[in-house]
Amino acid sequence: MEVFVVPVLADEGFEGPTKEVFQTPHWFDVGIGSVNLYLNKATALTIFAALFVGVIFWLGFRRAKIIPRGIQNLCESAYDFVDLQIARGVIGEKGARYTPYLLVLFSFVLVSNVLAIIPAAQFPATSRIAVPMVLAVVTWVMFIYAGIKSNGAGAYFKEMIDPAPTAPLAIRLLLGPIEILSTLIVRPFTLAIRLFANMFAGHLLLLVFSLGADYLLPKPPFVFGVASLLVAIVLTAFELVIDALQAYIITILTAAYIGGAMAHGEHEVAPSEELAEHAPVGVPAAAHA
């Protein structure tokens, strides 16, 4: 579709956001053999988000003090949140080693998303599918690495191929391909699509109401223009919440995938052991059976 159009106003000359909003023009192109390198707004904002996150954490931790203030306080608060609520909260104590990656992932996605409502930028870098796909591939490599490191390559891939060795053969033949497909393809694919679709749709919705307000305000009755403007303002605030929520979701899903990969090979707890674990101190598990 060449142009996104609001049908109600199309006959009056109003056109919604065009595809150029997301397919930003190239600022310059450089050809190196068969490789064509270019820079556009989307690429520039992606680079800016990465540099911004790196500089903020460098400033926060380069001269760390016992009593944190300013940027150091912000960085330590972000680290504690990701470490306690996501890394250790989802994976467990062994998740602490993955806190740096989860922190960088959360911070980069958050900054990239928030660029959608920053004047002059007004474009979420994550609304281009390439960015979420790269993040998903890195996460895919990370949880495969975590599974191999925790269980060994042989045990990890063996359980992926045969996740239920005690089940009947027909079930095993069914579960094996499903587990392989889920781990190697579905997880990174859905991780990328979820982030891309939310940011694309949110930015598109903001543009429709913002352009609608710009089109309707000079035209009587002015109530429609004012209403469109108010909706655009409310959606901007709502978009900020969605930006933070999407950063949190992709980070916690990454932690869940890493934790699941590390848990491969662990057998279910026997009922008696589970009862003993949750029984009050001094009371035998058998008393609760």
Swiss-Prot record:
Topological category with respect to the lipid bilayer: Multi-pass membrane protein
Keywords for the protein's UniProt record, in alphabetical order: ATP synthesis, Cell membrane, CF(0), Hydrogen ion transport, Ion transport, Membrane, Transmembrane, Transmembrane helix, Transport
Chain segments annotated as transmembrane: 41-61, 101-121, 129-149, 166-186, 189-209, 222-242, 244-264
Pfam families on file: ATP-synt_A (PF00119)
Entry-linked InterPro entries: ATP_synth_F0_asu (IPR000568), ATP_synth_F0_asu_AS (IPR023011), ATP_synth_F0_asu_bact/mt (IPR045083), F0_ATP_A_sf (IPR035908)
GO cellular component, one term: plasma membrane
Location within or outside the cell: Cell membrane
Superkingdom as given in the UniProt entry: Bacteria
Molecular-function GO terms, alphabetical: proton-transporting ATP synthase activity, rotational mechanism
CDD domains named in the record: ATP-synt_Fo_a_6 (cd00310)
Known role: Key component of the proton channel; it plays a direct role in the translocation of protons across the membrane.
Family to which this protein belongs: Belongs to the ATPase A chain family.
HAMAP family named among the record's database cross-references: ATP_synth_a_bact
Annotated NCBIfam families: ATP_synt_6_or_A
Assembly information from the UniProt record: F-type ATPases have 2 components, CF(1) - the catalytic core - and CF(0) - the membrane proton channel. CF(1) has five subunits: alpha(3), beta(3), gamma(1), delta(1), epsilon(1). CF(0) has three main subunits: a(1), b(2) and c(9-12). The alpha and beta chains form an alternating ring which encloses part of the gamma chain. CF(1) is attached to CF(0) by a central stalk formed by the gamma and epsilon chains, while a peripheral stalk is formed by the delta and b chains.
The protein's name: ATP synthase subunit a
Gene coding for it: atpB
